[in-house]
Amino acid sequence: MDYVLPYIDTSLDINLINKLGQRTSVPTTYLVPKSETTSTLISGSSDLVAVRITSEPLVSYFCENTESALISTSANLQGQKVASNMAELKAYFNESLSYALPPNKYNSEPSIIIDLVTGKRHR
């Protein structure tokens, strides 16, 4: 959880920040106000950054050993059917796909998306 702090607005209420570290029964992505130093390469033109805390062992391993958040893109392109296999992923991303985790219990379904501040569910 500490690895996301450089990317989010840490002046948020501590209860909201702590909510990011709470385990959920379904994959959950939170939209969180970004820090002033978060690159637009991560947030795009948005004032929010998408944060997903996971217990997926490989991702946890990378974060712990690099002492950093893992920055990734979603396999669920807005307005398109969810990619459910490698062939669909490759069709969506062409040559820009460098690696994808094989489907497992941590990543086989799209996450729900919730605005951390308002509580509004987007998906």
Regions found by a protein language model. Give the residues of each.
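Active-site-adjacent structural elements in enzyme catalytic cores
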Residues: M1-R123
